Amino acid sequence: ACCARLCCSVPTSPATTICSSDKFCRCGVCLPSTCPHTVWLLQPTCCCDNRPPPYHVPQPSVPTCFLLNSSQPTPGLESINLTTYTQSSCEPCIPSCC
């Protein structure tokens, strides 16, 4: 898995993670939204392929998929301004990756 070691886990509940495509990371970016991290840490932290992807137009605030595996409320998502990119060559975002 591309980012299994880099995503954080929440001791009290399953981690709520946003998996989105990034222009520099074909396999996806893991944003541990339920962890006490500052916004500057919500940056690309895992890449399966470091090669630059083909040119594409950014789609602001359009996540490719959500992995919400938690019965607890999801804090902080409204205050985080996400800019994601859709790429046809991206691998599917699977729960085992995060």
From Swiss-Prot:
- What tissues harbor this protein? Wool.
Q: InterPro entries annotated for this entry?
A: Keratin_matx
| One cellular component (GO) term of this entry | cytosol
**Which keywords appear in this protein's UniProt record, sorted alphabetically?**
Acetylation, Keratin
Q: Which residues carry this modification: N-acetylalanine?
A: 1
Q: Where are the transmembrane segments?
A: none
GO molecular function terms attached to this record: structural molecule activity
Does Lyase count among this protein's keywords?
no
**Is Acetylation given among the entry's keywords?**
yes
What assembly does the database describe for this protein? Interacts with wool keratins.
Family, as annotated = Belongs to the KRTAP type 3 family.
PANTHER family membership: KERATIN ASSOCIATED PROTEIN 3-3-RELATED, KERATIN-ASSOCIATED PROTEIN 3-3
**Role of this protein:** In the wool cortex, wool keratin intermediate filaments are embedded in an interfilamentous matrix, consisting of hair keratin-associated proteins (KRTAP), which are essential for the formation of a rigid and resistant wool shaft through their extensive disulfide bond cross-linking with abundant cysteine residues of wool keratins. The matrix proteins include the high-sulfur and high-glycine-tyrosine keratins.
- Protein name, as recorded: Keratin, high sulfur matrix protein, IIIB3
What organism does the UniProt record list as the source? Ovis aries (Sheep)
The root-end lineage is: Eukaryota, Metazoa, Chordata, Craniata, Vertebrata
